[in-house]
Amino acid sequence: MKKSFVKIISILLVLCMTLPIMASAMVAGEVSRVSVTINGDSATARGFCWYTDEKAGTDVQVAVVGADLTKAAIVSGVSYKAMEKYVHKAEVDTLKPNTRYQYRVGDSKTGVWSDVGYFTTPGKSKDEANFIVFADVQASNEENFQQAAKVLQSAVETMPNYEFAVGLGDFVNDCTNEEWDSYFRNFSFMNMNTTLVPVAGNHEGNLQWFKFNNMFNIGAAEDSMTVTGCYYSFDWGDAHFAVLNSNDMYPMSASQINWLKNDMNSSDAQWKIVLMHRALYSAGKNINKPDTVIMRNLLLPVIDELGIDVVFAGHDHMYMRTEPVKGEKVQVASTVTEYWNGESTTFALNPDGTTHILPSTAGTKRYGVNEDAMPPILESSALARDTKDGGVFATVSLDSNHFVYKAYMVDDETGEKSLIDTYAIKKTDRESINEDYEDLPTDIGSTVNQQGITLVIELLKMLVSYIKLLFSVI
């Protein structure tokens, strides 16, 4: 009896010592920071990224909604250590267009999986697209992440049929593990249940080398340097999107500009949209900074040349939308009012120019209007305002002839949503691909001379401008 008692006590002691270790191992294998992004053809491929605290398997299962996910094929990826954690990346390129999918990521050997997430692929036909746009969460504590998450929850409630979400950069403030954990924890309702289109912000790029690309699994352009982010493009519906990296070799590399020209000239989509972080048109505090001025001088002629319809940008934490502009001049367009999706909507008809939109910030760090912004900017604005009372999100719906944009502010105190701006475009014309266009070089070796010469010229231009300004003040 005494021996049996001692044996039982010994077993209990062993269990007491090993259970915490087992529990710790289970927690260590827990999946976090899950995101689904464009990686290849948007209709058939996705990139998955997630984190674990300890080394673990890198597996993903994807199945059509309604099928048994646990029986889906296991696709394995790669894992590496970064920021004292393990990054996991896997790609799936066998998806079907116009299909709703469920997925989970984790370790098939240990059976530690994430919660089930969802995403949708677009159709191959030129059908409608619906998406959410937000900018500059840039929080540094849990309270501010929670406040920004309320803004995006309102966005999802406003557009429950959204198919992807565009984040215009600066998801966090200092790129610490604590901030990224807080961001993904509070935004999991969106990040796990849609395709995210992330744009590299300066808070993920400046001296935060590789952190943007460690956080998302994106199909970057072939010659895109990934130190400070990346650039890439995709189609959705009858729209072609180019996602730029405004951290790229301040102010912007010749390689990236050449890529943008090649990319847009190869698309026959009705709508051509650019997504970037630092704005070309903004009444915010950063618009007169030298790097932004140079980038603006380099890119605006290209935007005009390519016939870009809309540019979405962030960075300045204030709200602004321009009239259609070309050559830094407002292009007046006629309007037509008609019912679209059950609403009476006034459309700008075939505008000859680009509309630049800066949808303020979804976060709590907000700035006012810079009255000293360059005259062409203030003169072109249809609306420029602060959003000090709440965070902002925007929705976009489009088809082959219509583009409808709406911006909302969510009050910090009441949580009530209010429509602060709306703009719509109707196109009855369609441009064909320029068959005579010849691709420009995009590799660094071929563009290094172009880069150096352009930078020197722009610096000299800026110096002359400052000298003129100085003499005008004296």
What are these regions (language model features)?
Residues 1-26, 455, 459-474:
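Gram-positive cell-envelope targeting signals
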Residues 10, 18-133, 138, 389, ...:
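Acidic, histidine-bearing metal-coordination/catalytic regions of metal-dependent phosphoesterases
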Residues 82, 89-91, 100-120, 177-268, ...:
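Extended active-site neighborhood of metal-dependent phosphoesterases/phosphodiesterases
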Residues 112-168, 173:
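An acidic-aromatic substrate-binding cleft motif
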Residues 133-135, 164-170, 196-202, 245, ...:
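Active-site neighborhood of phospho(di)ester-bond hydrolases with catalytic His/Asp-centered motifs
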Residues 139-143, 172-177, 202-208, 249-252, ...:
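Active-site environment of divalent metal-dependent phosphoester hydrolases
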Residues 146-206, 305:
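Core catalytic region of metal-dependent phosphoesterases/phosphodiesterases
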Residues 270-311, 323, 329-332:
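Active-site-proximal segments of metal-dependent phosphoesterases and phosphodiesterases across multiple
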